[in-house]
């Protein structure tokens, strides 16, 4: 189908949950794309970086079955396309929480995957849901996965555990949150999940008249080793457009940009480049708008973009981007207890000279607290961020590893 409405996804849906609960398998069942493509990911069997895949939700006009197929799996009739969506498959491994947090910044809605063959909740189930709450993602569907590995009685007991967890520990109302039993491995009950995604997830409304702005989540060098200099392609950046539109030929600015040493001091300079190609998932487009994940081919030196070097930066129309901040004044709200640890731990107040990890948009940076009062902290960043006043920030503290302890709002 060439309908322009379906060239670009209307929204980003995060796949979140504990390690090995089946997020990547479910993404593949829904999109046909295995998102663990990084060699280390394939070897270790876990997602390390954010993986992306698109799919189109469809419905059969004959028998009303929902699916992601062009031909109805029940009666074979041609299906109607309803909505294109992008999946952000985030890592569930506890040491990779920073990557999950930066992914949450570009999620409009989320599917929380909980394996039926393990007690609920597991540590990262708690932590991922808290991350969604902090970043402000309200639309969540719970998938009770791996139901092929348990008896009907065990599945019912496990369902009750999920309901209790949602009621007692989360911002979600179990009466309004769909909980759908699925076997991603066997593609069982996917029709019910697709219907819930279409009915429950509302694509956000974007300001298309505002200046173009995009959070960069990945950056690449697409050239193979040994490519002739005359055939080299410029660097590629990928991420989520949050406002405005961009066209081939537009000039864009990237902040904070590149680090330069000048008179013994480190400074950051914005980078300017031209858009030479645009891809919505794998579809080449002339113009891109918010919704889904977009790849932008540029004239940048590919060494600048390889291995996610520009991940966490912000691209946009020149002279319209937020300021680059080396220090942040945050109004903070801490959680009552640490999420993600096996044992219960109270969140202690933030102290001066403490080192914290902050996630601002898709950027993750470390900083030292220079001043700490009850609900306000000042923090000097190791790497600057491009951010507006009023932006939300996820705050993590080192407790064996980085643990989510609360959030802040940028005051200056």
Curated annotation (Swiss-Prot):
The UniProt entry, under Pfam families, shows: eIF2_C, GTP_EFTU
Q: Which residues form the signal peptide?
A: none
* Region of interest (G3), ranges: 89-92
User: Upper taxonomic classification of the species?
Assistant: Archaea, Methanobacteriati, Methanobacteriota, Methanomada group, Methanopyri
Names of the cofactor(s): Mg(2+)
Described purpose of this protein according to its UniProt entry: eIF-2 functions in the early steps of protein synthesis by forming a ternary complex with GTP and initiator tRNA.
Single GO MF descriptor:
translation elongation factor activity
- Record-listed GTP binding positions: 20-25, 145-148, 183-185
Q: Which catalysed reactions does the entry list for this protein?
A: GTP + H2O = GDP + phosphate + H(+)
Q: Where is this region: G5?
A: 183-185
UniProt keyword terms in alphabetical order = GTP-binding, Hydrolase, Initiation factor, Magnesium, Metal-binding, Nucleotide-binding, Protein biosynthesis, Zinc
Which residues of this UniProt protein bind Mg(2+) 1? 24, 47
Q: Where does Zn(2+) bind?
A: 60, 63, 72, 75
- Protein known as: Translation initiation factor 2 subunit gamma
């Amino acid at each position: 189908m060439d309908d322009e409405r379906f060239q670009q996804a209307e929204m980003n849906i995060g796949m979140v949950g504990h390690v090995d609960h089946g997020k990547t398998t479910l993404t593949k069942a829904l999109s046909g794309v295995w998102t663990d493509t990084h060699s280390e990911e394939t070897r270790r069997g876990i997602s390390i970086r954010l993986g992306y895949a698109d799919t189109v939700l469809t419905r059969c006009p004959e028998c009303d079955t929902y699916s992601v197929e062009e031909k109805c799996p029940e009666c074979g009739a041609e299906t109607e396309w309803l909505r294109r969506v992008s999946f952000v498959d985030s890592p569930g491994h506890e040491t990779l929480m920073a990557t999950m947090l930066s992914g949450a910044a570009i999620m409009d809605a989320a599917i929380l995957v909980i394996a039926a063959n393990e007690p609920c909740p597991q540590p990262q189930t708690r932590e991922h849901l808290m991350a969604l709450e902090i970043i402000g993602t309200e639309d969540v569907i719970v998938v009770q996965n791996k139901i092929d590995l348990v008896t009907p009685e065990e599945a019912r007991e496990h369902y009750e555990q999920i309901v209790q967890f949602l009621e007692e520990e989360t911002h979600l109302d179990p009466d309004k949150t769909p909980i759908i039993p699925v076997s991603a491995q066997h593609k069982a009950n996917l029709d019910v999940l697709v219907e819930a995604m279409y009915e429950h997830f509302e694509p956000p409304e974007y300001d298309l008249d505002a200046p173009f702005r995009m959070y960069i989540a990945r950056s690449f060098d697409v050239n193979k080793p040994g490519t002739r200099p005359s055939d080299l392609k410029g660097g590629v950046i990928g991420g989520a457009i949050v406002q405005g539109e961009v066209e081939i030929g537009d000039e864009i600015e990237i902040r904070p940009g590149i680090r330069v040493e000048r008179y013994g001091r480190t400074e950051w300079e914005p980078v300017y480049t031209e858009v030479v190609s645009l891809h919505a998932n794998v579809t080449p487009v002339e113009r891109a708008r918010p919704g889904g994940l977009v790849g932008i081919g540029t004239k940048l030196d590919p060494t600048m973009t390889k291995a996610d070097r520009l991940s966490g930066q912000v691209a946009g129309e020149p002279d319209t981007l937020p300021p680059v901040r080396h220090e942040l004044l945050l109004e903070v709200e801490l959680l009552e207890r640490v999420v993600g640890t096996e044992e219960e731990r109270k969140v202690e107040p933030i102290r001066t000279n403490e080192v914290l990890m902050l996630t601002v948009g898709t950027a993750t940076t470390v900083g030292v607290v220079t001043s700490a009062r009850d609900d306000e902290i000042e923090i000097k960043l190791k790497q600057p961020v491009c951010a507006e006043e009023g932006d939300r920030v996820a705050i993590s503290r080192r407790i064996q590893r980085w643990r989510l302890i609360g959030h802040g709002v940028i005051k200056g």
